[in-house]
Amino acid sequence: MDISRTEQRILHLMAQGGRIEIIRDDNRKIENVSCFTRDGWLYPGVDLDLFRRLKRLKAIKSSGGQPYRITERGLRLVRSQLDNR
């Protein structure tokens, strides 16, 4: 399955240890989505639509109220890239 360039970029960031945190409103609806790198920096490329696409692909998952992390399926979807570090 092909994924878009932005999805690829976010999954690669999450495969390196990044996470997606969500903020809910009073009605328990998702209000804001933030992506953090493994170093704790805020990554600006994630919006609610991209978050929903990744969740629909089952590439990310949250367990026990923790931030969203990449799944095994997400690791298979992401193509390997050089680390650039």
From Swiss-Prot:
InterPro entries: YjhX_toxin. Belongs to the UPF0386 family. NCBIfam families: PRK13687.1. This is UPF0386 protein RHE_CH01859. It comes from Rhizobium etli (strain ATCC 51251 / DSM 11541 / JCM 21823 / NBRC 15573 / CFN 42).
